[in-house]
Amino acid sequence: MAKKAPDVGDYKYGFHDDDVSIFRSERGLTENIVREISNMKNEPEWMLDFRLKSLKLFYKMPMPQWGGDLSELNFDDITYYVKPSEQAERSWDEVPEEIKRTFDKLGIPEAEQKYLAGVSAQYESEVVYHNMEKELEEKGIIFKDTDSALQENEELFKKYFASVVPAADNKFAALNSAVWSGGSFIYVPKNIKLDTPLQAYFRINSENMGQFERTLIIADEGASVHYVEGCTAPVYTTSSLHSAVVEIIVHKDAHVRYTTIQNWANNVYNLVTKRTFVYENGNMEWVDGNLGSKLTMKYPNCVLLGEGAKGSTLSIAFAGKGQVQDAGAKMIHKAPNTSSTIVSKSISKNGGKVIYRGIVHFGRKAKGARSNIECDTLILDNESTSDTIPYNEVFNDQISLEHEAKVSKVSEEQLFYLMSRGISEEEATEMIVMGFIEPFTKELPMEYAVEMNRLIKFEMEGSIG
């Protein structure tokens, strides 16, 4: 007998805790709210000016007319800033008890003890816990919450902040620029290579909450770093908004891998701008796992500015009932002999919709550049849908571009073969899906791969019958 499809209340991360915040802004977006955020953070005047200019841009810019339906997103019904505690603690014992219980349930302290070089935990609008191995500090590595970096490393911060994603980039980048709070700031000095990942974990707890972290990563010449972020939120009947901005600078011969495993509840709008500048022989890797949310619109972007620069995006998107995953990648070739790879894996079930939306651009100076794109979609029933929307711009005739797209269903032959060996239809379907996503999970650190497989199995419950 087939299992009953899980109710939203079965969502593992769907619990929410009592409100323990020490400050909560009024709902709605106004100039006073923006000034209040900046004042509470004791920011320099230039940052307040940046926020106010961004707010004006947000008001002027139109909503996206493509992608998913944003008509129910009410900016006046969102709380833009919630301060959960007085400061980010470096000792787990000093984190407020209610917040600590939340992260204990999510396994954050255990994960840190096992295999992380540093960890940051953000709850609502602020980082509540941050720690990094002392030996990394001694090497000159900076890993701190973005607000602290503004106060303590202002010159370095100001040099790179909003240089990759300006406020005018799009409406949601403007919104983030006006009300940003929290996020991670990482600087890795020349020729320093980190062998273990740095991690940040983002948790929305309140109803009608907006989370607007700002992450900035700088890998100096010859440096290497792997950053992992995880995201969850409780299940509510009303919507929350997650609108982050990620800026990464990969200098000459440097390497950055940015891994995301998001598992938002299905009442969250996830509208994120991620972009990196990659210089000579630098290498940027986006590894992007998208589960949950009401609507995700996210297209990690590599701007390849130096000769020999490389960019890649490996992504998985899973859309279930009432969910739209509008995701993809952008590769902008601006220099000779640059290369990019996009591998997109999408799964839809129970009427979910997955969309691959990608742009590959070859500029006039991109002689010898090449790009390879693979889009594979697995549809698990007749109610679910998939679209592939590639857009290629070519301004140099000495480039190479390959694009392969495939949409398939679980085949009767595969099911028959597995079921003839005593495996149930549900287990057989699950095995086929696991094989489909294996190119993604094999790129994750072992602990994350185990968690991703477990999340997919949870999403698969009730797919048969």
From Swiss-Prot:
This is Iron-sulfur cluster assembly SufBD family protein SAOUHSC_00851. PANTHER family: FES CLUSTER ASSEMBLY PROTEIN SUF, UPF0051 PROTEIN ABCI8, CHLOROPLASTIC-RELATED. GO terms for biological process: iron-sulfur cluster assembly. Pfam families: SUFBD_core, SufBD_N. Coiled coil: none annotated. InterPro entries: Fe-S_cluster_assembly_SufBD, SUF_FeS_clus_asmbl_SufB, SUF_FeS_clus_asmbl_SufBD_core, SUF_FeS_clus_asmbl_SufBD_sf, SufBD_N. The lineage of its organism: Bacteria, Bacillati, Bacillota, Bacilli, Bacillales. Belongs to the iron-sulfur cluster assembly SufBD family.
